[in-house]
């Protein structure tokens, strides 16, 4: 996701061992670098993909990131999640897991959780999402060695775990039906992602993969049945299901307490108060005026 410390994390992992260019055919910046770590002797290339909110191809950045994940077959995805805004960030996570590429979540800005009164049961969250989660602070360099270890470990696994079911029984049934009619050229771990995208009538996927007449009819029948029942378009139905899943797991893994204020925060709240702000401002201006006037009167002529 944008604004979750992605660039800071990339710089921390690669240092000066990076080069910048453009993705083929577009003006979107491409950044790659060699992993800067004593933890592994292997040469590991880290690619900094454009920050995106979802895997739907609505922006150039989303198209670039999606094409890379699906076509370049990276060994592992490090998914940066803002620990202080976890519910919104997990939407992309659910989509990345469906691609069949192994995912390791970097729960970034974890150092800010205590200050904001947030507690996250990382172990349980990892179990519910079925992927490793490492708490990090890219800015402070915390948790990076653990993140590297886990990413390399996951990348070396010989077998790829199949994405788990996260939707309602009804929608999962439709996904299963579509998976069963996909071409044999689609690998087992990617079938779920393509099935969901065919149900959503994703134009890029429909154009890139031609289905047989019978398969296309199956997809259309499943889509129409769901849209008719819910009186909504398929993409909105899937989006709603994702957020229901996210809200369910967040409700059992994230506790939000009272935010702990620093001295600076407390002062800010007082001086920006709608009732106290103006009197405080007038008092400060009077003190400044008095100090300047007094100094002027006491200076020798």
Model-derived features: positions:
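Conserved G1/Walker A P-loop phosphate-binding module
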Residues: 1-47
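Alpha-helical transmembrane helix bundles of large polytopic membrane transport and channel proteins
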Residues: 114-257
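Hydrophobic core segments of alpha-helical transmembrane domains in multi-pass membrane transport
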Residues: 281-290
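Loop-to-transmembrane-helix entry motif
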Residues: 270-274, 278
